[in-house]
Amino acid sequence: MAEIQFSKGVAETVVPEVRLSKSKNGQSGMAKFYFLEPTILAKESTDDITGMYLIDDEGEIITREVKGKFINGRPTAIEATVILNSQPEWDRFMRFMERYGAENGLGFSKSE
């Protein structure tokens, strides 16, 4: 089991686009998530966005760096950033993404 939540206990069903970057020394990195039309922004949803929670069998990774994107005053997307400050954090994040990707049909490709 691997899922993403914006409000504790409410799984996000929209699969994001994820972009990874790593520092030149390989010790730190960043993951940017982009959710187009996420269910948490649906008109019917009354849940507050309290962060982004990446939850799997090992536990959870939490970020509070979550931003809404608006078009014509209407919320349309969420962009969230996870900062990875060490190799163990990077490794943990990649294990989560392997599980999440396998369950949600995400693939991994390196940029040119």
Curated annotation (Swiss-Prot):
InterPro entries named among the record's database cross-references: Psb28_c1_sf (IPR038676), PSII_Psb28_class-1 (IPR005610)
Entry keywords, A to Z: Membrane, Photosynthesis, Photosystem II, Thylakoid
Spell out the Gene3D superfamilies in the cross-references.
Photosystem II Psb28
Q: Name one Pfam family in it.
A: Psb28
Q: What membrane topology does the UniProt entry give? A: Peripheral membrane protein
Keyword Membrane, does the record have it?
yes
- What is an annotated GO biological process for this record, any one? photosynthesis
Whether Thylakoid counts among this entry's keywords is yes
The highest taxon in the source lineage is Bacteria
Principal location: membrane
Compartments reported by the entry:
Cellular thylakoid membrane
Family membership noted in the UniProt record: Belongs to the Psb28 family.
According to UniProt, the name of this protein is Photosystem II reaction center Psb28 protein
Species source reads Synechocystis sp. (strain ATCC 27184 / PCC 6803 / Kazusa)
The taxonomy runs: Bacteria, Bacillati, Cyanobacteriota, Cyanophyceae, Synechococcales
